[in-house]
Structures are given as C-alpha cells and as structure tokens.
Amino acid sequence: MHTQVLFEHPLNEKMRTWLRIEFLIQQLSINLPIADHAGALHFFRNISDLLDVFERGEVRTELLKELERQQRKLQAWVEVPGVDQDRIEALRQQLKSAGSVLISAPRIGQQLREDRLIALVRQRLSIPGGCCSFDLPTLHIWLHLQQAQRDAQIETWLASLNPLTQALTLVLDLIRNSAPFRKQTSLNGFYQDNGDDADLLRLMLTLDSQLYPQISGHKSRFAIRFMPLDSENGLVPERLDFELACC
C-alpha cells in the first residue's frame, strides 16, 4: 500500500494542456480490451475529451518548441565536467527523432475526428442516456463483433496518436526529472515561494495526514494551502513537512 501521495500542478497553460492530454491517453488504455457497453463508453468519452482538448490550442506547435528547448538545455550540459556524455547524446537524439516524427505526422487527432463510429458516439455523449442501443445501433453492433476485430480497430486509433504520445512522454519525463524533491515546511497550513520560471510543481504528502493541497500561482510565484480531506473534523498541523519539486 502506498504511504505517500504525489500531487502535480501546472504553472502555465501549456503544461495544463499536456497533463490533461497525458491523463486522457492513459485512460484510453485502462479498460482494454473493450468487451461491454461500460468499457466502450469510458473509451469513447475519453476520445471525445481528447479531441476537445486538441481543438483548443496549438498542441503540436507548443510541443515542437519544447523539444527544441530541451535540446538546447542538454547542449549546455555537454561541456560540464563529469557529465555522462553518452546519456546526453542519446537524449538529444531521442528529442530530435521525436520532433521529426511529430512534424511530419498528420494533424493531431485527424484520423479520430474523421472516423464515423467515433463521430456518431461523440454526438450522443452529451445526452443523458443517449448511447442506448436504439440511439446508437452502430455502437450496439460494433460491441457484438469478434473481440479481435474490435481490438484491431482500437489499435489503429491509438497508433494514430503515437507521434504525439512519444513526444509528450519524452518532454514530460525530462521536465519531471529536471528538479529534485526537497523537504519544505508549511506554517498553519500555508506555504508560498518563488516559482523561478518553473513549469510544474510536484508535491509529495504522507497518506496518513489525509491532507490535500490547493495550489495557485504561476511560473514566478505560487502559494499552497493544505486542506483536510474531512472538512468537518480534520485538522491541519501547525507545522507540516512535505516534499516539493519545482520543475
């Protein structure tokens, strides 16, 4: 059983978008293979949410900029004594490769947008109970196909996201590992500090405290208020130790 809980909070809009995309892509694989109506609705709802996120911003452009920025950061480490040069070069090649694949890929989510079944289900998701068999006979018969046939179609859908997934995973991994966790202490449930142009806050709390953070701020400055899960009887200690990484 976990004894600590990790919380992550974005400090700018691009990071907020990336974390949402990462979350939705992870959700797509949780209930695979799809064998029933509940699993299908979970899958298609996450597909629909993902397409909505894609339509709100320049996801590809921002990721390509970040891939280039990370390459420049790695270049600055090349001449530092004691640095693993082979590791640096391997990461640079991964970033370069991910950028090449992403820039040459079709519009992100285009294959999913143009799929007839996905489009039909998306139209009904906002209607309470709108995905019944009489509303969506197409989905109904799809769920009665051979499992292998459904699996193959889902694999094709997910494969269309691979250029995005590869680049996003690489970028987020580098950002998350760009700063170590350090012990901090809040006073009367409150903590604030400078962001130092960070993109992401990562905060570790012990589970037995049953507290959660409410975080506000941006890349220059942020504030954390610790709240009890039990809003009526829970207590926040005068001094609370936690671990924080500004990435």
Swiss-Prot record:
<dbReference type="Pfam" id="PF07072">
    <property type="entry name" value="ZapD"/>
</dbReference>
<dbReference type="InterPro" id="IPR027462">
    <property type="entry name" value="ZapD_C"/>
</dbReference>
<dbReference type="GO" id="GO:0043093">
    <property type="term" value="P:FtsZ-dependent cytokinesis"/>
</dbReference>
<dbReference type="InterPro" id="IPR009777">
    <property type="entry name" value="ZapD"/>
</dbReference>
<comment type="function">
    <text>Cell division factor that enhances FtsZ-ring assembly. Directly interacts with FtsZ and promotes bundling of FtsZ protofilaments, with a reduction in FtsZ GTPase activity.</text>
</comment>
<protein>
    <recommendedName>
        <fullName>Cell division protein ZapD</fullName>
    </recommendedName>
</protein>
<keyword id="KW-0131">Cell cycle</keyword>
<dbReference type="GO" id="GO:0000917">
    <property type="term" value="P:division septum assembly"/>
</dbReference>
<dbReference type="InterPro" id="IPR036268">
    <property type="entry name" value="ZapD_sf"/>
</dbReference>
<dbReference type="GO" id="GO:0005737">
    <property type="term" value="C:cytoplasm"/>
</dbReference>
<dbReference type="GO" id="GO:0032153">
    <property type="term" value="C:cell division site"/>
</dbReference>
<comment type="similarity">
    <text>Belongs to the ZapD family.</text>
</comment>
<keyword id="KW-0717">Septation</keyword>
<keyword id="KW-0963">Cytoplasm</keyword>
<comment type="subunit">
    <text>Interacts with FtsZ.</text>
</comment>
<keyword id="KW-0132">Cell division</keyword>
